[in-house]
From Swiss-Prot:
Assembly information from the UniProt record: Part of the 50S ribosomal subunit.
Native source species: Sulfurimonas denitrificans (strain ATCC 33889 / DSM 1251)
GO process terms (BP): translation
GO MF entry, a single one: rRNA binding
InterPro entries on file: KOW (IPR005824), Rib_uL2_dom2 (IPR014722), Ribosomal_uL24 (IPR003256), Ribosomal_uL24_CS (IPR005825), Ribosomal_uL24_KOW (IPR041988), Translation_prot_SH3-like_sf (IPR008991)
Protein name: Large ribosomal subunit protein uL24
Keyword rRNA-binding assigned: yes
Gene3D superfamilies with a match to the protein in the record: 2.30.30.30
Entries under PANTHER family matching the protein: MITOCHONDRIAL RIBOSOMAL PROTEIN L24
Cellular component, GO, one term: ribonucleoprotein complex
Stated role: One of two assembly initiator proteins, it binds directly to the 5'-end of the 23S rRNA, where it nucleates assembly of the 50S subunit. One of the proteins that surrounds the polypeptide exit tunnel on the outside of the subunit.
UniProtKB keywords: Ribonucleoprotein, Ribosomal protein, RNA-binding, rRNA-binding
Family that this chain belongs to: Belongs to the universal ribosomal protein uL24 family.
SMART domains: KOW
Length: 76
């Protein structure tokens, strides 16, 4: 397995996609999938069904993984 150059907490810049130019923090690293989850980028709405804890249900905004080729590490 190749060495991964990103760690949780690193500051990165999105270099491709809808969030191009955004600088944010890495929340999680997924080395097997070759992806990272970046705070506030690639947000999708997930529908939540009503449950006993959440009787209303509704929508949840969630960050989705971004391929590492679309992310560049920024020296702080």
């Amino acid at each position: 397995m190749a060495k991964f150059k990103f760690k949780k907490g690193d500051t990165v810049e999105i270099i491709a996609g809808d969030d191009r130019g955004t600088k944010a923090t890495v929340l999680a690293v997924l080395p097997k999938k070759n992806k990272v989850i970046v705070e506030g980028c690639k947000i999708v709405k997930k529908a939540i069904k009503p449950t006993e804890e959440n009787t209303k249900g509704g929508h949840l905004n969630k960050e989705m993984p971004i391929d590492v080729s679309n992310v560049r590490k920024v020296e702080a």
